[in-house]
């Protein structure tokens, strides 16, 4: 009975996503003018696809991350990918300037971001995970320390950077769907699909892993290997989304917990689907608000950060009372 209710709830979320997509693609469009209509579709379609891909990457990664860590108020930003992204772009502007190839070529910047973040993720969750005897808390601590380390270096570089370069850099450090490259979208989908295929065996074991280490091992699961590979997959998903549109730190926390509270189930297939759908609603609705109400004066990441901070405090207070 509960499964049927959740299927109905997911269907409602899907309808809301479709409504948000239709609203985003049609609001403010001049249908009577074919040229303006074609121009609007050409501009909005890549943005919409980017929001759908980002919601899929962050939504699915956040649920997997929380289940792996066994904590529902943590977010994948603890892995340090957001700060590493900021450091990479700051270093490029500091060393080569805003007119350099990496600064102006979106495809090259995406490839470099993904390569560096992927290399760091592989080092942490392959080498250091073994060195810490597969201790998840140690790995999270390493991620937190690296986040502070990357942030400190980035702050130091911005303090001695040319003010004009820093002003240009700020547009890169804020998550934006305004200038999305179609080639990047194709590459992002390919990367996400390859990661999902590579870790498909671990994904189907999520329901078992949440029972705890001892129970999972008794059921024949190679627990340490599964956790290591899932954390690597989460990091690659977050790295892909961040390299594509920029850092969205609190989005994962919001949509993952909305999915858990709305569906109230331990089935990860439903939780991940719900998280992805909530992510699409938040991003598309937020971008529609940015474009039509605030006329691009405030980026969507600001609303997500403010809303995520308030929601995080709410989660802390409710869990403390419980």
Locate the predicted segments by residue.
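Alpha-helical transmembrane segments in inner-membrane proteins
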Residues: 1-322
